[in-house]
């Protein structure tokens, strides 16, 4: 993609880049308002998720995760910015007049043609069942349950790999390093999600992060003892414990939060790293 490089002495825009091909003009029939209530609070108004609040107003774009336009080719018309996710989205015009948004596959440009269904070519942006894909295929937007829509590998730069097929199940290596089983009847999209370098983007200032709805993160060691187990002491004091803890006293940095008995444990062959 063509990129525009800012050359200014201002820290907020210094060395910043903008994709010239990426626009932000959503279609009216594919967007709707979404009331963001609470912003980290529960029904009683108590903070349950810290560091959330503020943020610019957003319109939700309806993304086609199911890809159920079978055997109808579509053309990429625009590549757009979506404020609700870190991946770009692209507008597809199908041959029957239908218009939908999908996640932008890496390398896809305006004018490319995509299609979904069985026995379709193994090319970037096409969606087909895992049973029709060869081993080693890079995929994203993977279904867990047939017909429910893609739920795995949807973030910017995410890509999974099909490593084995046996019986009715396929073995996938997910971006987290987890190896799990998925039904071969589930759909997946060929390729990698675009906007790969989003994690290397420099926001430049605190205000840019506030626009994203993220509030400042304060270290526990600079708090008072009443607010955090790491707090207190004279001057620049250590945490005073053998291991770091959360604000509620539980072990931090490596504590597993997944439920011990979950229905999907039998489908996970290797835990994530």
From Swiss-Prot:
Database matches in SMART domains: Ribosomal_L2, Ribosomal_L2_C
Stretches the record annotates as Disordered: 1-22, 225-273
UniProt-listed PROSITE patterns: RIBOSOMAL_L2
Localization annotation: Plastid, Chloroplast
GO biological process: mitochondrial translation
Cited HAMAP family: Ribosomal_uL2_B
Family classification: Belongs to the universal ribosomal protein uL2 family.
PANTHER family the record matches: LARGE RIBOSOMAL SUBUNIT PROTEIN UL2CZ_UL2CY, RIBOSOMAL PROTEIN L2
This protein's name: Large ribosomal subunit protein uL2cz/uL2cy
Organism in which the protein naturally occurs: Saccharum hybrid
Lineage: Eukaryota, Viridiplantae, Streptophyta, Embryophyta, Tracheophyta
